[in-house]
């Protein structure tokens, strides 16, 4: 089973997105505290001020709340604007 943390930020100005994307590129550095997650970044189609970071954890990781890495990412992005941080899991297969 996989887990997905989605951290979205809404900036006050679209001009901040360049700095925000540069910061996100630095997030790709290896995570040294446990299994390394897969990271993907998305820009909103409808709003130039919205960016979303998707952190995908493999089945070996069990989360009951935001991960330490997710909390670190959220903290870094909070300087840019309003934050939404949600946790999703894949549904368990039925028999």
List each language-model region with its residue ranges:
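Short amphipathic alpha-helical segments
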Residues: 13-38, 68-76
């Amino acid at each position: 089973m996989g887990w997905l943390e989605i951290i979205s930020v809404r900036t006050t100005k679209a001009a901040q997105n360049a700095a925000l994307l540069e910061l996100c590129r630095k997030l790709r550095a290896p995570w040294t505290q446990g299994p390394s997650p897969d990271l993907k970044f998305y820009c909103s189609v409808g709003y130039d001020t919205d960016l979303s970071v998707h952190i995908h954890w493999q089945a070996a990781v069990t989360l009951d709340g935001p991960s330490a890495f997710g909390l670190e990412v959220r903290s870094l992005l909070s300087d840019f604007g309003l934050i939404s941080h949600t946790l999703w899991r894949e549904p368990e297969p039925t028999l």
